[in-house]
Structures are given as structure tokens and as C-alpha cells.
């Protein structure tokens, strides 16, 4: 049985920039709303991290002397319009290898953990609740931003090396019994779904997207000892979601069923090289009452990892979530919701 018995999970981002919340605001509100039902809480990925991988583009790639900006989105506060509006970089002529001193996730995690610990000591956050740190997996943080296959491979190695150091720093700085690390897996999903632009000839990297995804997980999990929880968030995106539209509007691709998510969960857990405590998979609102959508859960094989299903949608709230839970429960007996 997994150590994680949470009934509810916040995947990462919580507050919109216009809410004006800081880390403490996020944690106080989250603890008040779902604290007794959640086994871990994030810091809300506020500020630049709200725009997910664009945080890496703005803070790391755009400032690197060997990377040249070809284009970037034009919306204020660096918010992209959609999946075709990312920054785009190239690597300078003659450069064969690049390196990053840091990406920034370790520094953000350590600052947020200090607030988490204070709030827990004050009784705002319950004892035993863990602090969750969400980090983009390698392909998600690199492929949308780079101009050629050769440069993608160079950037893949550079980000991977840097993020391995950062997760080690996080594990060295935060008590293991207080920590949960989640890999955010999105572009890897797009590659497996066969989306245009995500299949190409590769020389250094494994060309099969599932093998490449598993190779990445094995590599970045090596610095994470047993003790901290480890989780996989298998994501179809929310970047293009607009207020007033359904939650499906944010997905880069319609999720017709959970086959790809189950495949990635099963293979990912085996690849990590250590125990995995939780898995989170997205649920398409438009297909959420279709029993066939959930049937792949029958072959979910993730050992003791606790599974969270993205069954909560703004369109129909609690009533809709309960109906989707009942359908999903026919194919998976034990799960939390997100």
C-alpha cells in the first residue's frame, strides 16, 4: 500500500496572477479548503512559474550567452497565447555543448518550504502533510523552445544535467519526510500521441518516444533517494484555457481515452528506479461520462503508487465530479481526485 492516502490533490498551479496571492496566501487557502483531505500541498507555482515552462525560457534560456532568441510571445507578463506562441531559441554557431549553472526550481523550493514549515508549526498546515515540488521533465522543458533536432539534443542534455543537480539540492535541503517531488510530463505525452512537430530523426537520443521518456525518468530520478515521495503528473496541458470556456479548451489534444496515460504510468513507474508514491492523470470533460474512456484503468500496473484522477471540473462542480467518480470506480477501486 502506498504511503500516500490522500483523497484530493492540487497538481501545482493554484492562484492566477490577477489574484495577487503570494506563497503564504496559496498555502493558507489550500490548507483551509482541502487540508484535511490532502497529503501534500504545493506552493501554487506563483509568479513566472505560473506560465510553467515559460519560466525556464525567461529565466534561463533567454539569459544564456550561447542561446539566441529567435522569437517570443508578445503578451504582457510573458503569458503566451497558446501552444504555438512559445519562445523560440537557437544555439550560437560553433557551440557544441552548453551548460546551465541553475534552472531555478531548487531556489524557489527552498524559499517556499521555509514558509510551509512555519505555517505547519503554527498549525495552519496539518502535521504529516508534505510539501510538493513540481518540476518539468526534460522534453517538456526543452523541445517547444528550440529550432532544430541537433539543438534539441544539446538542450536536452544541458537541462537534464542542471535539473539533476537541482533535485539533489532540494533533497539535501528539505527533510525527506516533508518532501514530495512531482515530474510534470506534458510534451512527452504529445510525442507519444504523435502530434506534428514532435517526431523527428534523432542521433543522440532514443527516437522512440516511450523509450526516450523512460530514459529521461531514469536519469533524473537517480539523485532522488528513498524517503521523499515521488510522483508523475501525466498532463495534456491547460495553456490555451480561457475563462468562460470548458476546461477541455486548454488541452493540446483531445483525450479520447486513458490508454496513453495508463501506458505512460505503467512504463514510467518501472523506469524511475525507485518507489513511486503517486500518479496523476487528466480526464477530458467532454468524455468524462463515457465508460470506455476509463476502461484502460483496468490494466493500470503501478505497484503501490496512489492514483489521482482529474475528475474535478468547473463546469459541473461537485455533482459532476461525483458522477465521474462513480464511473471511474467501475475500473479502478482506489483513487483520489484532482
Ranges and model annotations:
Residues 1-78:
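N-terminal basic, low-complexity leaders that serve as flexible interaction/assembly modules and, when applicable
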Residues 2-14, 37-41, 128-134, 178-182, ...:
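Structural preference for beta-strand elements that scaffold enzyme active sites
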Residues 20-27, 103-119, 152-166, 203-220, ...:
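Well-ordered, non-membrane alpha-helical segments in soluble/globular domains
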Residues 79-175, 181-213:
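Active-site-proximal, glycine-rich beta->alpha crossover segments in alpha/beta enzymes
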Residues 115-128, 166-179, 215-230, 267-277, ...:
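A structural motif corresponding to the C-terminal end of an alpha-helix
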Residues 136-140, 184-188, 235-239, 281-286, ...:
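Active-site beta-loop-alpha junctions enriched in small/polar residues
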Residues 213-286:
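Long, well-ordered mid-to-C-terminal structural blocks that present hydrophobic/aromatic surfaces
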Residues 266-338:
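Catalytic-face loop-and-helix region of soluble metabolic enzyme cores
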Amino acid at each position: 500500500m502506498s504511503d500516500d492516502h490522500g483523497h484530493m490533490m492540487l497538481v501545482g498551479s493554484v492562484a492566477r496572477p490577477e489574484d495577487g496571492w503570494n506563497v503564504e496566501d496559496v498555502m493558507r487557502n489550500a490548507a483551509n479548503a482541502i487540508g484535511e483531505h490532502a497529503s501534500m500541498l504545493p506552493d501554487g507555482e506563483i509568479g513566472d512559474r505560473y506560465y510553467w515552462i515559460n519560466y525556464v525560457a525567461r529565466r534561463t534560456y533567454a539569459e544564456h550567452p550561447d542561446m539566441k532568441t529567435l522569437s517570443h510571445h508578445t503578451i504582457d507578463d510573458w503569458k503566451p497565447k497558446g501552444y504555438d506562441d512559445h519562445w523560440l531559441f537557437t544555439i550560437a554557431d560553433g557551440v557544441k555543448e552548453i551548460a546551465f549553472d541553475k534552472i531555478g526550481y531548487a531556489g524557489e523550493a527552498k524559499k517556499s518550504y521555509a514558509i510551509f514549515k512555519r505555517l505547519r508549526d503554527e498549525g495552519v498546515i496539518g502535521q504529516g502533510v508534505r510539501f510538493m515540488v513540481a518540476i518539468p521533465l526534460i522534453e517538456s522543458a526543452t523541445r517547444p523552445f528550440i529550432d532544430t533536432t541537433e539543438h534539441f539534443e544539446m538542450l536536452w542534455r544541458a537541462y537534464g544535467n542542471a535539473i539533476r543537480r537541482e533535485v539533489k539540492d532540494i533533497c539535501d535541503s528539505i527533510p525527506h519526510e516533508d518532501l514530495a517531488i512531482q515530474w510534470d510530463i506534458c510534451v512527452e505525452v504529445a510525442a507519444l500521441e504523435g502530434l506534428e512537430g514532435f517526431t523527428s530523426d534523432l542521433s543522440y537520443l532514443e527516437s522512440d518516444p516511450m523509450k526516450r521518456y523512460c530514459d529521461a525518468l531514469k536519469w533524473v530520478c537517480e539523485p532522488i533517494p528513498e524517503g521523499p515521495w515521488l510522483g508523475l503528473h501525466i498532463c495534456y496541458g491547460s495553456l490555451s484555457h480561457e475563462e468562460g470556456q470548458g476546461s477541455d479548451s486548454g488541452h493540446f489534444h483531445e483525450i479520447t481515452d486513458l490508454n496513453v496515460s495508463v501506458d505512460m504510468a505503467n512504463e514510467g513507474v518501472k523506469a524511475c528506479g525507485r518507489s513511486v508514491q503517486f500518479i496523476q492523470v487528466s480526464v477530458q470533460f467532454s468524455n468524462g461520462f463515457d465508460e470506455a474512456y476509463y476502461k484502460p484503468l483496468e490494466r493500470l500496473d503501478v505497484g503501490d503508487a496512489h492514483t489521482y484522477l482529474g475528475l474535478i471540473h468547473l463546469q459541473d462542480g461537485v455533482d459532476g465530479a461525483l458522477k465521474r467518480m462513480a464511473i471511474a470506480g467501475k475500473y479502478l477501486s482506489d483513487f483520489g481526485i484532482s
